[in-house]
Amino acid sequence: MNIGRKIHWVFFLGGIADILILDVVTKVLVVRGIIGEFTFIKGFFYITTFRKNDGIAFGIDLPMWLQIVGSLAILLLLLKIGFEYFFGRQQVSLFEHWLFGAVIGGGLGNLIDRVLHGYVVDFIVLRPFPVFNIADIGITVGLVVLFGTMWLSSRETKT
């Protein structure tokens, strides 16, 4: 494996580690009450006591076994597609590898919660969205920015 390929792996694994560590640490701090309620913008953006989210995205309720199997299937599918795309092309930036890792790290963070607790710990409120956590930020922001960078780079190659 050449040095260029190794750097891409470092960024990918770094994205996983960054989001996963932040997610696990913040959830532990919130659950233990070390981080209490904190307001950034009153009634709009704040940290709350933790909420047990026993559903999936946007509170959709499914049996726990289906949530775990579904989460694993989605993670494996993302890994398969991601590896084919990111590690099979020459023109993928380090930032894109980090973003891909952030998405996977977020998925792992929520999967760990489901397996260990039977629910996901949520604690960040940003109205009008449902309560969420760091893993959700890694997944959502990671995907949006990743698709944006992919779209921009595809436009650049066409011109």
Kindly give the residue locations of the regions a language model identified:
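Alpha-helical transmembrane bundles and membrane-interface segments of multipass inner-membrane proteins
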Residues: M1-T159
